[in-house]
């Protein structure tokens, strides 16, 4: 997909930006694809860049993603927790699988979804092949990741591990309002003014 460009006029003349770079100037990051290593590296770099620009100002992360690689998603998750800036998360369209984990990983009180968004949580998917020993190793790793991710969902929602294990056994779909009641987000929003970046709290 070709990324559109926007023209900005200043006292120095006109300058063309690709749309994502222009949004980055306003501290907006867009995750609008499946999560893989390349996408994760870009998102991580954008988070680190915005922190270096102003560690006391918030970041808005918009999510419209079906999920993807667990390790790539966890790289983004860890960086969101690592940077000093509060990261607001906003679901537009869908946040499924690792996309849902990134949505709920936003700063407390700053996790949002637009009214017609869809959120889905489930256990990590994986396939094993090769020798029996290799299959056993891969199966144990999938179980470890499942336990770890369920623990993160417990941490951010306050539910018991028993409920999360039950709910993620199969695809668990929620509307924006369902996700709010579940604790994945804090508010269903329609107007942007609610989610403008705010200064980081004093350390």
Swiss-Prot record:
Q: Which reaction does it catalyse?
A: Hydrolysis of proteins to small peptides in the presence of ATP and magnesium. alpha-casein is the usual test substrate. In the absence of ATP, only oligopeptides shorter than five residues are hydrolyzed (such as succinyl-Leu-Tyr-|-NHMec, and Leu-Tyr-Leu-|-Tyr-Trp, in which cleavage of the -Tyr-|-Leu- and -Tyr-|-Trp bonds also occurs)
Xref: Gene3D superfamilies: 2-enoyl-CoA Hydratase, Chain A, domain 1 (3.90.226.10)
The record's EC number reads: 3.4.21.92
Q: Does the keyword 4Fe-4S apply?
A: no
Record key words, sorted: Cytoplasm, Hydrolase, Protease, Serine protease
The record's note on quaternary structure and interaction partners says: Fourteen ClpP subunits assemble into 2 heptameric rings which stack back to back to give a disk-like structure with a central cavity, resembling the structure of eukaryotic proteasomes.
The protein in question is named ATP-dependent Clp protease proteolytic subunit 2
Say which species the protein is native to.
Myxococcus xanthus (strain DK1622)
Lineage of the organism: Bacteria, Pseudomonadati, Myxococcota, Myxococcia, Myxococcales
The encoding gene: clpP2
């Amino acid at each position: 997909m070709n990324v559109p460009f926007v023209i900005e006029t200043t006292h120095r003349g006109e300058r063309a930006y690709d749309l994502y770079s222009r949004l980055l100037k306003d501290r907006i990051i867009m995750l609008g694809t499946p999560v893989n290593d390349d996408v994760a590296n870009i998102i991580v770099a954008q988070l680190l860049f915005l922190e270096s620009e102003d560690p006391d100002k918030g970041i808005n992360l918009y999510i419209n993603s079906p999920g993807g690689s667990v390790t790539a998603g966890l790289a983004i998750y860890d960086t969101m927790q690592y940077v000093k800036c509060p990261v607001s998360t906003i679901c537009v369209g869908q946040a499924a699988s690792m996309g849902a984990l990134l949505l709920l990983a936003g700063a407390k009180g700053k996790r949002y979804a637009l009214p017609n968004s869809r959120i889905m949580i489930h256990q990590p998917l994986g396939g094993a092949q090769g020798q029996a020993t290799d299959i056993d190793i891969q199966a144990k790793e999938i179980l470890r990741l499942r336990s770890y991710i369920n623990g993160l969902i417990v941490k951010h929602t306050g539910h018991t591990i028993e409920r999360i294990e039950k709910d993620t056994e199969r695809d668990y779909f929620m509307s924006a309002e369902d996700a709010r009641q579940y604790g994945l987000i804090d508010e269903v929003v329609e107007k942007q003014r609610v989610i403008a970046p705010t200064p980081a709290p004093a350390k």
